[in-house]
């Protein structure tokens, strides 16, 4: 029997040996700033480009569509603020859920202070958001629907596909932002 049973893998998972070795290699052999013009910077940029290409291939998109950030909070901020600013001429309504990560909730609260309408869908007793809730909330003024794929506290799987269908059905100009950090 193990000394410890670890139940927090959704927050942080033990690093695989292969990953730890690669991180060590990058920290000791490839430590150049990828924006620098010297040899170490060039090598770091090559490794970064390769990682971007591998990620794009895995996701089935173009390498120019891949952005590396410091973590989920920064990524959520960039996605939500960027989408809101880009879409604001078509409406100023964002649909999200009341059970999002603080990275999302704080960002939409900031936008609310700027006059945006924020609809926060409330979960049922089991922590679930229904497809009907999303469908009812989305309209032609909705420019963004932001929801996590899996809730970071209770593990609820949110209706991402239903959100995409609701946007299409309502012909809303909305983009769909999915925080998949816990998925």
Locate predicted features.
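Pyridoxal 5′-phosphate
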Residues: 1-183
């Amino acid at each position: 029997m193990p000394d410890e049973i670890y139940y927090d893998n959704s927050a942080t998972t033990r690093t695989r040996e292969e990953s730890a070795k690669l991180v060590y290699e990058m920290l000791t052999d490839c430590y150049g700033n990828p924006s620098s013009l010297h040899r170490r910077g060039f090598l770091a940029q090559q490794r970064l480009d390769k990682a971007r290409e591998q990620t794009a291939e895995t996701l089935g998109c173009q390498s120019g569509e891949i952005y590396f950030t410091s973590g989920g909070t920064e990524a959520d901020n960039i996605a939500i603020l960027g989408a809101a600013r880009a879409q604001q001429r078509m409406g100023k309504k964002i649909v999200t859920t009341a059970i999002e990560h603080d990275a999302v909730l704080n960002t939409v609260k900031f936008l609310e202070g700027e006059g945006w309408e924020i609809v926060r869908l409330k979960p049922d007793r089991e922590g679930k958001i229904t497809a009907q809730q999303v469908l009812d909330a989305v309209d032609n003024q909705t420019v963004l629907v932001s929801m996590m794929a899996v809730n970071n506290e209770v593990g609820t799987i949110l209706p991402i596909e239903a959100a995409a269908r609701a946007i299409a059905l309502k012909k809303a100009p909305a983009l769909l932002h999915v925080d998949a950090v816990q998925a």
